[in-house]
Amino acid sequence: MKVLFVASEAFPLVKTGGLGDVLHGLPQALHGLGVGVRLLLPGYRTLLRQLDQVRIVAWFDVRGAEGPVAARVLETRHPGFDFPLWIVDCPPLFDRPGNPYVDVTGYDWPDNAERFAVFARVAALLAQDAHEAGWLPDVVHTHDWQTGLVPAFLADLPARPRTVFTIHNLAYGGHFPHGDFLRLQLPAHWWSHEGVEFHGGFSMLKAGIVYADAVTTVSPTYAEEICTPAFGYGLDGLLRSRRHKLHGILNGIDSATWDPADDPHLRARYTAGRILPGKRRDKQALLERFLPAADEAALQAPLVGLVGRLVEQKGIDWVLAAMPLLLAETDARFVLLGSGQAAYEQRLTRLARQHPTRVFVEIGYDEALAHQIEAGADMFLMPSRFEPCGLNQMYSLRYGTLPIVFKTGGLADTIVDTNEASLADGSANGFVFDTPDVAHFVDAVRRALALYRQPSLWRRVQQTGMRLSFDWRESAGHYLALYAADSAGEPDV
């Protein structure tokens, strides 16, 4: 089987979030299972600068907003991938500063509709082997709104590969005005309520849902949630009507990169069979980074970690509301790494100044520190209001750092609340609250702090989490089964 992945980012070449991690881990795992893989990416300036040797495999003139747009397709190899990469090199659309979707001031590029429509047109041509390279995919797997037009361009062709569209976050719909639809000269028959039209404009994400042969999202619970008005962003009715072709497949993690037994970022390594000595040394190293005079009392106190975007979706407002209370009534320390809305950054920084021996804050992102927090913290906060899949809770389980999460999306699929029943059957691996407010979040943290004072039970729950597997190979197996069933024309995979 041959699969063409089409996406707007992939780690380590370009990454703005979890999408980039998936577009590294999943294709790599499928390649390891014997699938022929190609990955198509836009030729961003920062991406092209990382490539050493490239060869031109195709030239296309495709329709843009103001007429034909010339695009080269480059083939290259990169140490991060075990298969060839294809890059759409179109300097007027992609050779620019800023990140893939926004300019240096943080605003969306005004021509995003054209950028990703052109990218999708090129992808559709490659999927038909229009460049006559002799590599014709059986499946084209597209990801998020930036690639939603690819299944639409392919849908009406008589002989074509099957298409799969993955929703990583329904909150980002790729919405554009009707004027862009007209300027791009998109097919007129798409413009309907049953097509891409959405509240007077059009949605590239909706195009993927409507025209793909199969639609997936990144956890079973999120697949259920997005079919409801609370999580559907106006597309829940469409998703309910497509429920027979909507599949929730849990993301995996890079088990080699996130491995406490072999992590180069740590002072000490450890395993599920021998947690305490190594994790204690990593906790000490983490404390010493922020508190050089850390004493035994600090080492014995619970250390609570957080790594993530400082935005409301991630529940950072609940964390900020809870911390003064927890600082007053417990001896817990907090270490937080992230960036986001300026108001939240400022409040955290102010809290750290007020409690310099108990609250440690790093604004920004530091890969090594992220690993060190996962290893050195005792528990990990992830109270997201919604979380399509989430990765950090799986990293935390692997590092014996018990997650405290809200019951939503992939968090609900991976974390089992610690209570009398789950302790008895051995499934407990973290702490879950299911009412979205500060009081219930605080209650979950208190329960975690109470269990921390029972070392034998705490160790048992740590070991349960560390022995779980979230390797990408398991997720890849589910996708491979979907590809095979969908290619065979089975509608209810």
UniProtKB/Swiss-Prot annotation:
NCBIfam families: glgA (TIGR02095), PRK00654.1-2 (NF001899)
Pathway participation: Glycan biosynthesis; glycogen biosynthesis
EC identifiers of the protein: 2.4.1.21
Family as reported in the entry's similarity comment: Belongs to the glycosyltransferase 1 family. Bacterial/plant glycogen synthase subfamily.
Enzyme class: transferase
Gene Ontology molecular function: alpha-1,4-glucan glucosyltransferase (ADP-glucose donor) activity; alpha-1,4-glucan glucosyltransferase (UDP-glucose donor) activity
Name recorded for this polypeptide: Glycogen synthase
Biological process annotations from GO: glycogen biosynthetic process
Any matching Pfam family: Glyco_transf_5
Reactions that this protein is recorded to catalyse: [(1->4)-alpha-D-glucosyl](n) + ADP-alpha-D-glucose = [(1->4)-alpha-D-glucosyl](n+1) + ADP + H(+)
Binding residues annotated for ADP-alpha-D-glucose, in chain numbering: 15
